[in-house]
UniProtKB/Swiss-Prot annotation:
This is Protein ApaG. Pfam families: DUF525. Signal peptide: none annotated. Gene3D superfamilies: ApaG domain. Residues 2-126 form the ApaG domain. One of its GO terms (biological process) is error-free translesion synthesis. It comes from the Bacteria. It comes from Shewanella baltica (strain OS155 / ATCC BAA-1091).
């Protein structure tokens, strides 16, 4: 792990979107707001994303692609980039984690880790 790997901090807030969910059809919609903070000394551009999404039944799906929400932001040192997206699960509980493929101002490619976070309907867990 290089210093660049630890120069990006990822914070996550999740929300269950009850009005767009349909539990009787096993469809649970969650939004997640991601804040990507550049703690390093160089600007870093987010080029790719790789998500691993697992529901409570152990079913896993992967999402890979360029950028996030149609953007490939460059995050200056000591600044942050925030976006909101969503996912649909077949269960009221799930976990997401993954990586962002980043490139530093000097052209070095590195991975920013997105630590596992929980998606859960309110009142499901105590």
């Amino acid at each position: 792990m290089s210093a660049l790997d630890t120069s990006i901090r990822v914070e996550v807030k999740t929300e269950y979107i009850e009005q767009q969910s349909s539990p009787e059809d096993e469809k649970y919609l969650f939004s997640y707001t991601i804040t990507i903070i550049n703690l390093g000394e160089q600007a870093a551009k987010l080029e790719t994303r790789h998500w691993i999404i697992t529901d409570a039944n152990g079913n896993t799906s992967e999402v890979q692609g360029a950028g996030v929400v149609g953007e490939t932001p460059t995050i200056a040192p000591n600044t942050a980039y925030q976006y909101t997206s969503g996912t649909v699960l077949d269960t009221p509980l799930g976990i997401m984690h993954g990586t962002y493929g980043m490139v530093s101002e000097s052209g070095e490619h590195f991975q920013a880790t997105i630590r596992p976070f929980r998606l859960a309907t309110p009142g499901l867990l105590h």
